[in-house]
UniProtKB/Swiss-Prot annotation:
Signal peptide: none
Carbohydrate attachment residues: 42, 211, 457
Parts of the chain that traverse the membrane: 3-23
Source organism (scientific name): Rattus norvegicus
Residues reported in the UniProt entry to bind Ca(2+) 1: 341, 419-421
Function (record text): May be involved in mediating uptake of synaptic material during synapse remodeling or in mediating the synaptic clustering of AMPA glutamate receptors at a subset of excitatory synapses.
Name of this protein: Neuronal pentraxin receptor
Length: 494
């Protein structure tokens, strides 16, 4: 029984102790605002209440049991007898009250820092404003420079001859190299227009960049912009100078071209006058000539008769070249399917006259550079590839192994005045014949030297048994003309 009574008493004491602790801690949790201002720990709170921290804790424990008030030490003022002002009850067992933050001198320091920062921001804004004004002035100067350069470019473009600006594609001639310059001029104009468009886009972007510069603190932007503007100005000036040089070159080239055109027109007018005063009917049928007044790739004559397979041939004709010393071109060419150079008589540039058979070449010692009428005959046989060349009835050269044992293929196209790169076409102006052709005849055998001399002297005229020179068999194209002409009567008058 005593043991049970002791256990019961101990339990009650433990229960009372727990209740006292709970009651002592309730004011701290319920009223945190009662903490002393500026207190940061238990010792400072206890000293502000006028009692040491440990004694306050003990008195809190004793207050639940009705203990007496605080004792008065000798020598203390009487006022200390009175209870201290209400403050937070501290507990060393549960928690420590935290005092509310109170204003300190840091607030005054923060206010001074804000004022300094405001002054710094104002100073920075003023610097940015000055930078923006300087940039705007530079932009205006750049804009004036761009307008001035654009005006110069417009004056250069407007100063070009309209004929050069509107020059379109034309037919190929020996002077085609000079007419390639307008294409280069158009390319330069396109490049200048592209630069002008870029400059206009930059002008449109400049106001927006000027507005943004007031808020952007980077002075490198104007530097990059100015460097780009300087680069564009340099490119534009280079283009303008190149355009002026090209204009001067084109003016010189156009003057020369104009002289050549006038010369060609005079030649054409002479042909027209010759046709107007000539006979309208050819008598006999072979008394005509084919005239090609200028070197080009579109004037020629075509023989309207098929050529059979040949194992030998003789081609004779009267020629008068008007090309001077720049090469006589191609008096005639015969092409077949699969071989454009089946038979070609050609003189290109400063090279001697050549005879091509199946792309095999033999050089002929003939000369037509004096602008006079000459009688030319070429004879060839497939056996051993023997060939002979006659000028004005005289044998000038001979040889062998020219396309030996190769028969001339049939069903080809024979062209007077042009060299064929394909069957019946794709002429090259640099290889064209300029002058007059008459009495072109083709035989299927080699003529004797006596027969050739008789034809050249007009003492024994012969008509080709494969291709005779007849008006109905020869058709002119591209401006080539047929006119009345009798070479034997001309020689008789001379």
């Amino acid at each position: 029984m005593k043991f049970l009574a002791v256990l019961l008493a101990a339990g009650m004491l433990a229960f009372l102790g727990a209740v006292i602790c709970i009651i002592a801690s309730v004011p701290l949790a319920a009223s945190p605002a009662r903490a002393l201002p500026g207190g940061t720990d238990n010792a400072s709170a206890a000293s502000a209440a006028g009692a040491p921290g440990p004694q306050r804790s003990l008195s809190a424990l004793q207050g639940a049991g009705g203990s007496a008030g605080p004792s008065v030490l000798p020598g203390e003022p009487a006022a200390s007898v009175f209870p201290p002002p209400p403050g937070p009850l501290l507990s060393r067992f549960l928690c420590t009250p935290l005092a509310a933050a109170c204003p300190s001198g840091a607030e005054q320091g923060d206010a001074a820092g804000e004022r300094a920062e405001l002054l710094l921001l104002q100073s920075t804004a003023e610097q940015l404003r000055q930078t923006a004004l300087q940039q705007e002035a530079r932009i205006r100067a750049d804009r004036d420079t761009i307008r001035e350069l654009t005006g110069k470019l417009g004056r250069c473009e407007s100063g070009l001859p309209r004929g050069l600006q509107d020059a379109g594609p034309r037919r190929d001639t020996m002077a085609d190299g000079a007419w390639d310059s307008p294409a280069l001029l158009v390319e330069l104009e396109n490049a200048v227009r592209a630069l002008r468009d870029r400059i206009e886009r930059i002008e449109q972007e400049l106001p927006a960049r000027g507005n943004l510069s007031s808020s952007a603190p980077a002075p490198a932007v104007p530097t990059a912009l100015h460097s780009k503007m300087d680069e564009l100005e340099g490119q534009l000036l280079a283009k303008v100078l190149a355009l002026e040089k090209e204009r001067a070159a084109l003016s010189h080239g156009s003057h020369q071209q104009r002289q050549e055109v006038e010369k060609e027109l005079d030649a054409l007018q002479g042909r027209v006058a010759e046709l107007e005063h000539g006979s309208s009917a050819y008598s006999p049928p072979d008394a005509f000539k084919v005239s090609i007044p200028i070197r080009n790739n579109y004037m020629y004559a075509r023989v309207r008769k098929a050529v059979p397979e040949l194992y030998a041939f003789t081609a004779c004709m009267w020629l008068r070249s008007r090309s001077g010393g720049s090469g006589q071109g191609t008096p005639f060419s015969y092409s077949v399917p699969g071989q454009a150079n089946e038979i070609v008589l050609l003189e290109a540039g400063l090279e001697p006259m050549e005879l091509l058979i199946n792309d095999k070449v033999a050089q002929l010692p003939l000369s037509l550079k004096d602008s006079n009428w000459h009688h030319i005959c070429i004879a060839w046989t497939t056996r051993d590839g023997l060939w002979s060349a006659y000028q004005d009835g005289e044998l000038r050269g001979s040889g062998e192994n020219l396309a030996a044992w190769h028969p001339i293929k049939p069903h080809g196209i024979l062209i007077l005045g042009q060299e064929q790169d394909t069957l019946g076409g794709r002429f090259d102006a640099t290889q064209a014949f300029v002058g007059d052709i008459a009495q072109f005849n083709l035989w299927d055998h080699a003529l004797t030297p006596a027969q050739v001399l008789g034809i050249a002297n007009c003492t024994g005229p012969l008509m080709g048994n494969v291709l005779p020179w007849e008006d109905k068999l020869v058709e002119a194209f591209g401006g080539a003309k047929k006119a009345a002409f009798d070479v034997c009567k001309r020689r008789a008058k001379a």
